[in-house]
Design a protein with these regions (language model features):
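A short N-terminal interaction module
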Residues: 1-101
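Short, charged/polar micro-motifs that form catalytic or ligand-binding hotspots
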Residues: 22-29, 109-114, 143, 147, ...
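Short, solvent-exposed secondary-structure capping/transition elements
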Residues: 48-52, 108, 132-136
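Residue-identity detector for glycine
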Residues: 86, 97, 102-104, 111, ...
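Class I SAM-dependent transferase core
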Residues: 94-129
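Conserved S-adenosyl-L-methionine
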Residues: 117-185
Length: 186
């Protein structure tokens, strides 16, 4: 059924094809979980190589990548590049959330139905002035999403903040989720 989904953007279609090509030898959910975990570890290590967590992160990274052939590992890198390309072409989207839902990976038992980006954009547009006021008064402001999914609301808030020219150093975005993979997508 997930193969029948048609995505609107070239990067999403390419991502879907690569994802499904990895699912010949591995279960869909495992490929997604492994890809998201590896991508999150790569981002975390690129930002902070001195953390006490770096060694355990790299150990997890290696144990995941050992399951995949060199060609499959290369597809992980290509999939990450497609996400970057997609977000650079259009930052006003929830690339991973749309992929997650479109590939049929949500878990209705956990209540995983991601809010569409258009709804998140509307909420962000309504909320941004109050956040901007708080940042101006206190020198900083935060936005917390306690069930962040792939982070669509936080992405929309960030995009609204950019449009309002709110200094990024005055904002703290926090995303949490009961599902580790969803939190790593954020």
């Amino acid at each position: 059924m997930a193969n029948a989904v048609r995505f609107n953007r070239k990067s999403q279609n390419e991502f879907s094809k690569m994802f499904h090509s990895l699912c010949d030898r591995h279960r869909n959910w495992q490929v997604w979980s492994d890809f998201i975990t590896v991508a999150a570890i790569e981002i975390a290590c690129s930002i902070d190589r001195t953390s006490d967590d770096t060694k355990s992160r790299m150990s997890e990274y290696k144990s995941i990548m050992e399951k995949y052939s060199p060609d499959e590992r290369a597809k992980f890198a290509d999939m990450f590049a497609l996400i970057v390309d997609g977000l650079e072409a259009n930052p006003e989207q929830d690339f991973l959330g749309e992929m997650f839902m479109g590939l049929g990976l949500s878990n209705h038992w956990k209540g995983q139905v991601f809010t569409p980006y258009s709804v998140c954009h509307m909420i962000a547009a309504i909320s941004i002035d109050a956040i901007a006021d708080k940042a101006e008064q206190n020198g900083w402001a935060s936005a917390v999403d306690p069930c962040c999914g792939a982070g669509a609301l936080l992405i929309a808030l960030r995009n609204e903040a950019v449009q309002k020219q709110i200094p990024p150093t005055s904002l703290l975005f926090v995303g949490q989720d009961i599902d580790r993979v969803a939190a790593l997508m954020c």
